[in-house]
């Protein structure tokens, strides 16, 4: 469960290391975001020679949360950290590699590119 001011790790090779959620997209009163939701993020920590610089604002999709996601069969999938993949304005991933596992819930028409790049789909 991600809200404003939440810090997330970046699960791609864009050069950003840590981002902070500055807005949960999808309604004026929406407070929380989960796996598969798009948020606005500000880059807090970046690699020296990366594509993305500190202070820039991007869209991102959440791929892992410590809160987890409940499946229809009753199982609960949780992760150790909160992680996101940075997107451009067309909601396509900027990076060319994804690090760590992602969940099956991303397997929609919008995020099939992320699922295909991921090393493991849980």
Swiss-Prot record:
GO biological process, one term: translation
Keyword Ribonucleoprotein set for record: yes
Gene3D superfamilies: Ribosomal protein L14
Pfam families in the cross-refs: Ribosomal_L14
GO cellular component: cytosolic large ribosomal subunit
Alphabetized UniProt keyword annotations: Ribonucleoprotein, Ribosomal protein, RNA-binding, rRNA-binding
InterPro entries linked: Ribosomal_uL14, Ribosomal_uL14_bac-type, Ribosomal_uL14_CS, Ribosomal_uL14_sf
Keyword Transmembrane recorded: no
Domain of life, source organism: Bacteria
Gene Ontology MF term list: large ribosomal subunit rRNA binding; structural constituent of ribosome
Its job: Binds to 23S rRNA. Forms part of two intersubunit bridges in the 70S ribosome.
Family: Belongs to the universal ribosomal protein uL14 family.
Assembly with partners or alone: Part of the 50S ribosomal subunit. Forms a cluster with proteins L3 and L19. In the 70S ribosome, L14 and L19 interact and together make contacts with the 16S rRNA in bridges B5 and B8.
Name of the protein in its database record: Large ribosomal subunit protein uL14
